[in-house]
A protein has these predicted regions:
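Amphipathic alpha-helical interface segments used for dimerization/assembly
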Residues: 109, 219-222, 240, 262, ...
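Extended serine/threonine-enriched, polar tracts that run as long, contiguous segments within proteins
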Residues: 180, 184, 188-235
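TPR/TPR-like (Sel1-like) alpha-helical repeat modules
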Residues: 232-245
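Short coil/turn linkers that connect adjacent helices within long alpha-helical scaffolds
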Residues: 88, 198, 202-206, 245-252
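Histidine/cysteine- and/or acidic
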Residues: 145, 244-261
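Amphipathic alpha-helical protein-interaction segments enriched in hydrophobic
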Residues: 94-100, 206-221, 255-263
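N-terminal alpha-helical interaction modules that lie
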Residues: 1-191, 195, 257, 264-294
């Protein structure tokens, strides 16, 4: 969560900075800050809850997942419609806006991608098996033998027919499809991260908090969503090198941010490596984020 904490700190600071000249932009930034704080708490809860469950037991917290996707959707819309078109004159805000857009799409990839690429995705078969619309009774799972029927319901005679399943080749629709289309968000998210990295490299020095925030989340994205452990470790390693090579002066606050994020990047350099520093299965997702990340 350290990367998010840096983003939230700059959101508040930059919103106050532009408030006098552009009150509309400031109000939108404060709204995004509120969304980001709520989204951070929800994603942490979802990840912890998923890790606590047995691997064979699907996550049943549909409302939590729907809220996560809704918050990310609203944040992305505010950025694309109001913030990004107005950030041309603000260096730090431009980097932050493009980074946050990538972050919101990172959420879509984690929780609402089709096909699923993480264990937290709503559209995984296990999650869909127990996903229910709030207010309706959930289906009961008969210990892996199929969906159990209520004992007090009479079976439907075959002559009268019954519920019609989807045609062959068409699986059940994602429970969150009414919020966001169930499509592959991975290419879009990857391109947005590349764009944010390029802008950060162009406008900010190597030890700047926002540049480190961009690189830290990009490394996490490469590992847990793209499943490219080697690329993730390379980004982490190169970013640490850029910090040590930077000659620009920084204040105490930025120094503390740099120390925290470099420590996280140091751990990310070792993700996917065995005890003898040999690569394990590429990009294996064990359901846990690196320390300091959601």
């Amino acid at each position: 969560m350290a990367s998010l904490e840096v983003d939230q700190k700059y959101l508040g600071k930059l919103a106050k900075t532009v408030e006098a000249d552009n009150p509309l932009l400031a109000s939108i930034l404060f709204k995004i800050l509120g969304l980001s704080i709520n989204l951070s708490a929800h994603t942490v809860k979802a990840r912890k809850q998923r890790r606590l469950e047995h691997t064979s037991r699907p996550n049943q917290s549909l409302e939590l997942y729907l809220h996560i996707i809704w918050l990310a959707r609203e944040g992305a819309l505010l950025l694309e419609q109001y913030v990004i078109p107005m950030v041309g004159l603000y260096v730090e805000l431009k980097v932050l806006a493009y980074k946050l857009r990538a972050s919101f799409y990172h959420i879509f990839v984690q929780f609402h991608n089709h096909p699923p690429v993480t264990k937290w995705d709503l559209s995984t078969p296990e999650t869909q098996a127990t996903a229910t619309v709030p207010g309706l009774a959930p289906q009961r799972i008969d210990k892996g033998k199929g969906i159990a029927k209520d004992d007090d319901l009479d079976p439907v005679p075959s002559s009268e027919g019954g519920p019609v399943g989807p045609p062959p080749g068409f699986g059940p629709e994602s429970p969150a499809a009414f919020l966001m289309p169930a499509v592959d968000y991975l290419p879009h998210a990857h391109n947005y991260f590349k764009e944010a990295v390029a802008i950060a490299d162009q406008l900010l020095w190597g030890s700047h908090s926002l540049r480190l925030s961009v690189k830290t989340e990009y490394a996490a994205f490469l590992y847990e969503c793209v499943h490219d452990a080697e690329a993730s470790r390379t980004v982490a390693k190169n970013t640490i090198g850029e910090v040590y090579d930077a000659t620009e002066g920084i204040d105490n606050d930025m120094f503390n941010d740099a120390c925290t994020l470099v420590a996280i990047l140091g751990k990310m350099m070792k993700r996917g490596l065995g005890s003898n520093n040999t690569a394990e299965a590429t990009g294996t997702d064990n359901g846990a984020a690196p320390p300091g990340m959601i």
